[in-house]
Amino acid sequence: MTNLANAKKEELVKMANFKCHHGHSGLSHPACYFKNNGVKEKILFFDIEAEDLNADYGIMFNWYAMDEDGNKFEDYITLDDINKYKSSDRNIEPKEDSRIVKSLIDLMSKYNRVCGHFSCGYDLPFTRSRAVIDKIDFPAYGTIFQSDTWVILKRKFKLSRNSLENGCKKLIGRSRKDRLSLSIKHGCLRGEKWAINLSRKHCENDVLDLVELFKATNRFMRRTNSSI
């Protein structure tokens, strides 16, 4: 059991009475509770694609994820999402990504650790920001742990660039990395399938590279209990 929504009453009582080394109960820091009680860690590798690097200037287009068992997940905006939030009011916050932001958060909540590349600086803060803007609940501090292959490269290796592409090329010998052009991003904003499909493939390739890079490098660094 790694999702509080699936917890039985007896388990919730145990979690409420538990105190971790941070001074929190198992309800506020469930990841600490799971670790202390020998619950097997479940890792979700993920990546997002968005209109802009800042969540107040762009929406999420799509996301892709894979767990350690090879289960694959994804979601992406559709023309229905775009039409649902169509407005001529200049003061309305764009919320076309509300559905896929929620589906990503729902998936993340089923795992006790997530991993991305520079996810500590981009994917997670962006998703959290979009969730708050879209009025969607985001997991509280201490709920889910995080790992980041960018941090591993930065602290344990000495490369000219700590990008996912460079890390994979130099340490693994290949990278699937491509680039999303401005025309593709604008196509995504219009809900055009050709653009969305290219963004989906780009995101999938990033996650495949991420998983390979994590497997090649994670043994060189202690797995910390840093919260999302």
What do the PLM-derived regions correspond to, one by one?
Residues I43-L44, N112-V114:
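Generic beta-sheet signal
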Residues I43-F45, K72, I144-Q146:
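Conserved beta-strand scaffold positions in the cores of enzyme catalytic domains, especially
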Residues A50, N54-Y85:
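RNase H-like nuclease fold core
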Residues G58-E68, R113-S227:
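Metal-dependent phosphoesterase core characteristic of DEDDh/y 3'-5' exonuclease domains
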Residues M1-K42:
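N-terminal accessory regions of nucleic-acid-interacting proteins
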Residues E41-D52, C203:
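Two-metal-ion RNase H-like nuclease active-site motif
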